[in-house]
């Protein structure tokens, strides 16, 4: 056994011997293990930080050193032992002879030697480097050599035995004699063996100890890491647990609310289903009844129509026959009388001649026949001739004359008879054709109506659209409707008689002149006599038309009672089928009107204006026209009918071209030919009714009631010189076309007068054409609706007659007719210049009236087809048709090319380019990097004296800055860049050049923005949507107007040098604040971290980069915000940065920022001067210059300026940041969290519980930025302040009246009840919590304009404010009857009015989605104040019966004001009220701003007043009351001002800020015991949903601060709407004036636009292309 052990030991020694290497070299020398092995496990435990790796390496190094130390100690001990053993061996060798060593002893010695060697080898292997190995290169490096000096040589024991245990040696005598030494040797050997065993044991123990220690250390480090991870997880889980607990409570509350809402909805659904069933049944019954009525009505209508047609036809026939017979009889009687008279004269003349001849024959004196005395008249001085005295007579001439006259009379009688007969035939034929055409059209109309469906059919049966009776079929009044059919062959001289110029007129007039009947084959159904009817060129070639009447004759269709006809009978409403009398197609005063076969000067009075519809022809006295050469002095413009201007459709009158005709005076309509001729001549002996010159008005045409009621053309034409005229009354005079000078000029000159372009819309008459006279027959259906004339013919009685709209076919001919009319005459050109002014797109369509019966003109589309109209080159009307857009073009100057060279007008050109280039060029010192947020940051030039930021109102306040005090505000949103301030750039010498970098895209190019005093070509303000432009001092307005960069609360980082810029107070002249423009891409401005970049002092730069994006300017207010320039510290800000920031903050001067809030002139953004308190969320205007604080109220932030980021960007940011952050913020971060900058992106609070008390006690910051350093500013709180606050909160929570439908809230903060305000996305001002209830900084004592209370929130002032707000008097003497003591008596009147109710315009709901539509209907609204219920019905319930209509109602949960740009129906207020109720929204609009305010005030007050259900809590201070007096955290229900105008003024308050996103809401406190509101008690429903979702989403990123789910707590609407007076005309204007007066000593608001109406900061934060961006302020 011992041998085997020795063998094993030897084998182990061979294996483990470091000096022995196998010949194959399979083992490498363990040189790498000189030190302790590297513990890879230690580094596998998430050595994610350099510090952890460093700790691992240090541990490894210490371990290695320890092991080296222990190895050295062991080696030393072993060497000493070896020396001792060698000494003893020598002694043994010396004493060998003295004692005999036995085999056993020798064996032990050999074993001891072997073990010694093994120990030495192991020791050497463990502690010695390989280089210390002995041996040569022969491959036996480790084997014992024969060297005697080798410690491994067996000869070491030579003194005790032979060289080899196997060597046979004879012991010396001395050894043998000294046998007693053997025992000593054995003893020594045993000792050595035991020692070696102990050494080996100790070595093994040491190795085990080392292994154990290493394992323990590794385990310890691993456990430490795990413990740290577990601690973080536990901390996170604790936070999540609290959040989940609150969330669960909130969700449970919501579940109950939703269950109640579902129950309500189910009930409503049941009711609605039943209502729907009833309505459906009612509807079906009504439809059946309606169908029955329709059928019955249709049958009756058809019967009636048939009967009426038959009656009309019969009556027409009878009247026609009667009138024809009467006219023929009268005519023949007149002719007979004429003939008798002529015959009597002739007989007298013959008898006289016979007597003379007899007398001559009785005389004996015979005169020679050739005597000249026959040719001489009796001398004047001769005595009167005696009967027997011979007086020379021209008997022959008289005889010939009488014979000629008699022949002419016979011929005339024959012609008239043939004409009468012929026209009778033609009229009968035409009437038949017309009747057939009407029948066919009626049939077609019925067919088309039937095809169109029941809607059109039903509409057709309405009274206003029913086909009117046609008086033209009744016989008497048809004389001007008659179509004269001219047969060119019936009279041989027709061709000679017709004026030659009429052919051209016909060619032009073809479209308008020809009756519609001739246009379509459909109307030639039964006529075989097409040839006898007029052809295109025959119109004025014949003499049968009434133009040739002499007054004693009457046309066949004329009746004796024509003078008694009423206007309706005469000017009948005709369908387009009525043929136009050819007389209407003749030019006014055409030669043909005088060319009568038997006219005498006495008969010419009857020649009426051929173009007039004969109303005046038969009604005006027939004066004898006094022939003058001046009669034709003025000729009616071509195509101008007497009624044309005023009777044209309103659509034409409203067109821009009407300006051509408006300023010309014209004779009134309806004048006779005499009147019009007299009007032209103007002599005192002219005939006709007096002229009344009425300016043509664009209103619907007015007709004078009498027969003279037609108004001549409104255009007075400038004609060529008066043509020479001769008396043309005698038939025998040769027709001289030259006398009628206008005959040729009618086409060229007269026609060139600007015809009112509107008239082309008349399709059937020639009015739109170049006929110089008034149109023939005007179809009332297309032109005007004639009214019955009054008996008197006074021209003063004017009726407004609606004109029908343009017909479908009118549009087809419109262009052609217009082309003909417009010449290039100077008059026309002068008139055309106005067209650009008429850029008004007055849509003439709107005035169309229902009376226009366009349905009847089915067939009239064919009319324009026939004769092509030659278009004269003068035609210039086409631009009029496109007038609507053309005027804009002339107005727009050619846009100057945007060049970097400064062009004052160009404000847009360089916006795009502006982005970064100007900054680089201007950087004076490269030291601090400028981060240009992709686009906006403009490097400001230091010398820009104006706070170049929107220098709009920059009253240059002299900057008192020290150059080192530049405060740089960097939005964290641009993470990469060191402070991107233009501040450094400001030192650049280009003093005046204010960067276009503010490139605000919408900056109105109004004023050339900057004057570059240097030649530096400043890029013209590039209006890139965001930059606030730094303007030089002079340009107060310039580019800022549209700058949409709404500085999202830029956090100003104060350099340590940032000195008290306070002195700059009143001077905002600090040069360009280059606003760090983040591009519209919303670089997310999460709380900007302080950058330590050293900025070269720019003496005047106050704050440079305000990172703001896209704030379309809304009303500008010059308010100044004084910011203490707090550093924006994130939770993760390193301590060193925090320290430097704190120091910088103390030294940094407050920034004075122009307030950007919309409605308040001064109050909103400003800080009260004493305390510097500022609107926590108010956007910092880029021009803010540090300056002395000025007293002003601080605004609550109603909408976060942080809303620049979209939700996707925010989520991405959070994900990116989550990976880098520690899971839980260190405790030191809580301090940062408490003092987070108001401008930092709001962070979702990770643990609500520790700050539970703070939730309800949010402090009002001492100044806009004081929140960042609130911990340092305020006096220390007592050590147990949190416990005290928690106890107080708990007490107040317990005292709240319990809601019956809600579960008991958790003992956590009231956030569970109020939709957990802790977790909802916060406005920046919420990020700073004040710990402690005694917020008694002196700076808070200034007046609070927002909440109408002082800013002090101590217990006493809080109580007094409660008394003031809620009228809490300990023992109120009385309360208004019917109202609780909490009712503001000033609101009772408004509430009473709403109780009584009125008609408002309610938006309907879409049938499918139930969303609010764009249409409104009128409903009667009233309110029940106690139940807070809004009722409405179709009728006034006071006057309507019980059966009339149903009343609907909703419970009023909240009311908001929304901007409303819906133009229909016109005349309503520009804002609507939206009442939020469980499950739906009701939106309605008041008629005036006063009514709007009354309703909004009353509804708001009802929601916020103390109702009976919560009166018991009135005198108790609850968490809601505490929140009430913390401006940023008032409960939503009280977020709107409750005071009437008088009360708000009496308390010296300012108006609340105007809405930012387009709506304002009042919310009712949901403490009604029996109702579980589906909306969170103090939040909008949509916000509650988003807030809860954001809470859920952020629970998983619990330690990531800065997540917020929406763009601001009130993104839906600004609750600080100027509640009681939010319309433009209200008291706010006065406040604006007062505030402006207060602000004269302050900075100009360089971010204002629109003359101060808007301010960039308060504009919508959404993208400029989002639908809501321009709701409130459609800027530019």
From Swiss-Prot:
GO cellular component, one term: cell cortex
Ranges where the PH domain occurs: 1393-1504
Basic and acidic residues bias spans: 355-370, 439-448, 461-470, 479-489, 503-522
Superkingdom of origin organism: Eukaryota
BP GO annotations: conidium formation; maintenance of protein location in cell cortex; microtubule cytoskeleton organization; nuclear migration; nucleus localization
Chain intervals with Acidic residues compositional bias: 678-687, 1511-1524
Positions with biased composition (Low complexity): 163-172, 593-602, 1032-1042
Record's subcellular location: Membrane
Composition skew (Basic residues), residue ranges: 623-636
Coiled coil: 51-127, 193-359, 408-453
Compositional bias per record (Polar residues), positions renumbered to this chain: 1-11, 609-620, 647-664, 1191-1201, 1314-1341, 1534-1548, 1580-1589
CDD domains: PH_PLC_plant-like
Transmembrane region(s): none
Chain segments carrying region Disordered: 1-35, 160-180, 353-394, 439-712, 1027-1050, 1176-1201, 1220-1270, 1297-1354, 1511-1589, 1654-1676
Molecular functions (GO terms): phospholipid binding; tubulin binding
Membrane topology: Peripheral membrane protein
PROSITE patterns: PH_DOMAIN
Keyword terms of this UniProt record: Coiled coil, Membrane
InterPro entries: Nuclear_Pos-Cytoskel_Interact, PH_dom-Mcp5-type, PH_domain
Role description: Required for nuclear positioning and completion of asexual development.
PANTHER family named among the record's database cross-references: NUCLEAR MIGRATION PROTEIN NUM1
Identification of the protein by name: Anucleate primary sterigmata protein A
Originating organism: Emericella nidulans (strain FGSC A4 / ATCC 38163 / CBS 112.46 / NRRL 194 / M139)
């Amino acid at each position: 056994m011992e041998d085997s052990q020795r063998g094993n030991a030897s084998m182990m020694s061979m294996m483990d011997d470091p000096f022995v290497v196998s010949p194959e070299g399979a083992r490498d020398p363990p040189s790498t293990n000189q030190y302790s092995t590297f513990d890879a496990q230690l580094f596998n435990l998430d050595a994610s930080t350099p510090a952890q790796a460093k700790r691992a390496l240090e541990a490894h190094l210490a371990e290695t050193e320890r092991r080296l130390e222990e190895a050295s100690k062991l080696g030393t001990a072993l060497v000493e032992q070896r020396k001792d053993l060698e000494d003893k061996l020598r002694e043994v060798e010396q004493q060998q002879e003295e004692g005999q060593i036995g085999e056993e002893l020798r064996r032990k010695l050999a074993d001891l030697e072997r073990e010694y060697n093994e120990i030495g080898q192991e020791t050497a292997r463990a502690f010695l480097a390989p280089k210390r190995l002995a041996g040569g290169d022969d491959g036996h490096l480790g084997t014992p050599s024969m060297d005697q000096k080798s410690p491994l040589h067996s000869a070491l024991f030579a003194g005790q035995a032979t060289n080899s245990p196997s060597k046979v040696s004879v012991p010396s005598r001395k050894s043998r004699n000294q046998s007693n030494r053997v025992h000593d040797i054995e003893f020594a050997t045993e000792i050595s063996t035991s020692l070696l065993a102990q050494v080996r044991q100790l070595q093994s123990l040491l190795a085990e100890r080392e292994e154990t220690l290493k394992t323990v250390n590794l385990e310890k480090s691993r456990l430490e890491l795990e413990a740290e991870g577990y601690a973080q997880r536990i901390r996170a889980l604790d936070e999540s647990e609290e959040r989940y607990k609150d969330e669960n409570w909130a969700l449970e509350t919501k579940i109950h609310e939703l269950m109640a809402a579902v129950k309500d909805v189910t009930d409503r659904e049941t009711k609605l289903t039943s209502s729907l069933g009833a309505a459906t049944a009612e509807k079906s019954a009504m439809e059946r009844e309606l169908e029955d009525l329709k059928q019955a009505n249709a049958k009756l209508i058809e019967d009636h129509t048939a009967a009426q047609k038959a009656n009309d036809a019969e009556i027409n026939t009878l009247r026609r026959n009667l009138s024809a017979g009467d006219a023929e009889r009268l005519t023949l009687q007149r002719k007979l009388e004429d003939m008798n008279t002529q015959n009597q004269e002739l007989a007298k003349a013959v008898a006289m001649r016979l007597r003379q001849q007899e007398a001559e024959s009785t005389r004996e004196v015979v005169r020679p026949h050739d005597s000249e005395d026959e040719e001489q008249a009796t001398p004047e001085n001769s005595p009167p001739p005696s009967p027997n005295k011979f007086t020379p007579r021209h008997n022959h001439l008289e005889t010939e004359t009488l014979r000629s006259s008699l022949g002419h009379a016979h011929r005339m009688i024959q012609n008239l008879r043939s004409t009468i007969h012929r026209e009778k035939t033609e009229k009968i034929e035409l009437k038949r054709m017309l009747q057939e055409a009407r029948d066919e059209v009626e049939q077609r109309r019925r067919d088309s109506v039937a095809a169109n469906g029941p809607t059109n059919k039903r509409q057709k049966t309405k009274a206003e659209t029913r086909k009117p009776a046609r008086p033209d079929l009744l016989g008497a009044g048809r004389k001007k409707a008659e179509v004269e059919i001219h047969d060119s062959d019936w009279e041989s001289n027709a061709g000679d008689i017709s004026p030659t110029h009429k052919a051209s007129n016909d060619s032009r007039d073809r479209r308008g002149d020809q009756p519609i009947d001739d246009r379509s084959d459909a109307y030639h159904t039964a006529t075989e006599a097409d040839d006898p009817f007029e052809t295109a060129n025959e119109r004025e070639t014949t003499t049968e038309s009434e133009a040739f009447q002499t007054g004693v004759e009457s046309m066949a269709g004329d009746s004796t009672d024509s003078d008694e006809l009423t206007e309706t009978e005469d000017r009948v409403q005709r369908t387009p089928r009525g043929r136009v009398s050819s007389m209407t197609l003749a030019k006014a005063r055409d030669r043909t009107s005088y060319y009568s076969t038997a006219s005498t000067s006495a008969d010419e009075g009857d020649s009426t204006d051929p173009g007039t519809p004969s109303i005046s022809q038969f009604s005006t006295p027939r004066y004898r026209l006094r022939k003058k050469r001046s009669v034709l002095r003025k000729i009616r413009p071509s195509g101008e009918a007497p009624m044309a201007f005023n009777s044209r459709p309103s659509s034409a009158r409203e067109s821009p071209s009407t300006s051509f005709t408006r300023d010309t005076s014209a004779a009134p309509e309806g004048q006779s030919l005499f009147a019009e001729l007299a009007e032209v001549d103007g002599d005192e002996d002219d005939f006709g009714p007096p002229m009344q010159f009425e300016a043509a008005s664009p209103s619907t045409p007015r007709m004078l009631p009498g027969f003279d009621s037609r108004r001549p053309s409104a255009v007075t034409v400038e004609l060529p010189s008066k043509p020479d005229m001769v008396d043309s009354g005698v038939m025998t005079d040769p027709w001289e076309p030259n006398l009628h000078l206008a005959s040729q000029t009618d086409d060229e000159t007269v026609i060139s007068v600007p015809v009112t372009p509107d008239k082309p819309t008349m399709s059937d008459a020639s009015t739109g054409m170049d006929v110089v006279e008034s149109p023939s027959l005007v179809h009332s259906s297309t032109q005007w609706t004639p009214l019955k004339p009054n008996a008197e013919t006074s021209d003063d009685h004017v009726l407004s007659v609606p004109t029908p709209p343009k017909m479908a076919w009118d549009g087809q001919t419109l262009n052609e007719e217009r082309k003909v009319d417009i010449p290039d005459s100077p008059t026309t050109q002068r008139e055309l210049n106005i067209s650009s002014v008429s850029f008004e797109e007055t849509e003439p369509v709107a005035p169309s009236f229902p009376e226009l019966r366009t349905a009847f003109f089915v067939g009239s589309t064919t009319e324009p087809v026939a004769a092509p109209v030659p278009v004269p080159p003068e035609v210039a009307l086409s631009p009029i048709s496109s007038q609507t857009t053309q005027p804009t073009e002339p107005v727009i100057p050619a846009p100057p090319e945007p060049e970097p060279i400064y062009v004052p007008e160009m404000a847009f050109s360089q916006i795009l380019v502006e982005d970064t280039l100007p900054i680089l060029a201007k950087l004076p010192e490269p030291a601090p990097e400028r981060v240009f947020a992709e686009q906006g940051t403009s490097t400001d030039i230091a010398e820009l004296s104006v706070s170049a930021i929107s220098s709009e109102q920059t009253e240059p306040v002299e900057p008192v800055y020290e150059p080192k005090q530049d405060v740089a505000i960097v939005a964290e949103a641009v993470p990469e860049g060191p402070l991107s301030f233009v501040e450094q750039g400001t030192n650049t010498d280009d003093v005046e050049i204010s960067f276009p970098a503010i490139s605000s895209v919408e900056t109105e190019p109004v004023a050339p923005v900057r004057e570059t005093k240097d030649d530096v070509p400043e890029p013209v303000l590039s209006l890139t949507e965001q930059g606030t432009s730094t303007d030089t001092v002079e340009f107060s307005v310039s580019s800022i107007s549209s700058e949409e960069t709404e500085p999202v609360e830029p956090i100003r980082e104060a350099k340590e040098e940032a000195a008290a810029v306070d002195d700059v107070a009143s001077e905002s002249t600090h040069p360009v604040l280059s606003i760090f423009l983040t591009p519209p891409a919303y670089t997310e401005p999460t709380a900007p971290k302080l950058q330590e970049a050293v900025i070269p002092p720019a003496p005047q730069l106050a704050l440079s980069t305000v990172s703001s994006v896209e704030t379309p300017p809304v009303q500008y207010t010059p308010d100044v915000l004084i910011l203490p320039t707090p550093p924006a510290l994130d939770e993760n800000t390193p301590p060193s940065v925090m320290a430097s920031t704190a120091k910088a903050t103390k030294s940094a001067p407050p920034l004075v920022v122009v307030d950007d809030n919309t409605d308040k002139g001064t109050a909103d953004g400003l800080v009260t001067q004493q305390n510097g308190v500022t609107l926590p969320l108010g956007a910092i205007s880029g021009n803010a210059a540090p300056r002395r604080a000025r007293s002003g109220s601080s605004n609550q932030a109603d909408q976060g300026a942080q809303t620049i980021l979209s939700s996707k960007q925010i989520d991405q940011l959070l994900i990116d940041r989550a990976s880098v952050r520690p899971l839980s913020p260190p405790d030191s971060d809580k301090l940062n969290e408490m003092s987070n900058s108001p401008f930092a992106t709001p962070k979702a609070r990770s643990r609500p519980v520790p700050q539970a008390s703070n939730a309800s006690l949010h402090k009002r910051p001492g100044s806009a930025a004081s929140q960042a350093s609130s911990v340092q500013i305020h006096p220390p709180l007592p050590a147990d302040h949190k416990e005290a606050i928690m106890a107080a909160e708990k007490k107040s929570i317990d005292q709240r009246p319990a809601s019956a439908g809600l579960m008991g809230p958790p003992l956590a903060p009231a956030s569970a009840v109020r939709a957990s305000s802790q977790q909802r996305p916060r406005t920046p001002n919420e990020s700073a919590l004040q710990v402690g209830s005694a917020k008694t900084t002196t700076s808070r004592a200034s007046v609070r304009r927002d909440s109408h209370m002082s800013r002090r929130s101590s217990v006493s002032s809080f109580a007094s404010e409660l008394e003031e707000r809620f009228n809490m008097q300990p023992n109120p003497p009385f309360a208004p009857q019917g109202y609780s003591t909490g009712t503001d008596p000033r609101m009772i009147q408004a509430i009473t009015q709403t109780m009584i109710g009125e008609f408002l315009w309610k938006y309907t709901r879409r049938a499918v989605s139930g969303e609010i539509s764009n249409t409104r209907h009128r409903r009667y609204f009233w309110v029940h104040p106690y139940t807070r219920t809004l009722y409405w019905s179709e009728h006034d319930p006071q006057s309507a019966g019980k059966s009339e209509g149903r009343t609907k109602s909703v419970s009023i949960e909240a009311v908001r004001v929304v901007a409303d740009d819906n133009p229909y129906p016109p005349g309503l207020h520009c804002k609507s009220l939206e009442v939020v109720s469980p499950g739906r929204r009701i939106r309605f609009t008041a008629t005036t701003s006063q009514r709007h305010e009354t309703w909004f005030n009353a509804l708001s007050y009802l929601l916020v007043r103390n109702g009976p259900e919560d009166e018991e809590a009135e005198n108790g201070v609850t968490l809601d009351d505490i929140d009430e007096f913390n401006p940023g955290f008032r409960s939503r229900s009280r977020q709107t001002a409750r005071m009437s105008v008088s009360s708000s003024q009496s308390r010296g308050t300012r108006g609340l800020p105007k809405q930012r996103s387009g709506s304002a809401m009042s919310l009712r406190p949901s403490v009604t015991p029996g109702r579980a509101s589906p909306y969170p008690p103090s939040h909008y429903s949509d916000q509650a949903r988003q807030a809860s979702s954001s809470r859920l989403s952020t629970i998983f990123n619990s330690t990531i601060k800065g997540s917020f789910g929406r763009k601001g707590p009130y993104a839906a609407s600004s609750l600080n709407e100027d509640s009681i007076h939010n319309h433009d005309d209200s008291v706010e204007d006065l406040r604006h004036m007062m505030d402006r007066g207060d602000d004269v000593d302050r900075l100009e608001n360089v971010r204002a636009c629109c003359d101060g109406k808007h301010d960039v900061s308060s504009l919508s934060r959404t993208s400029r292309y989002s639908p809501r961006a321009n709701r409130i302020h459609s800027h530019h």
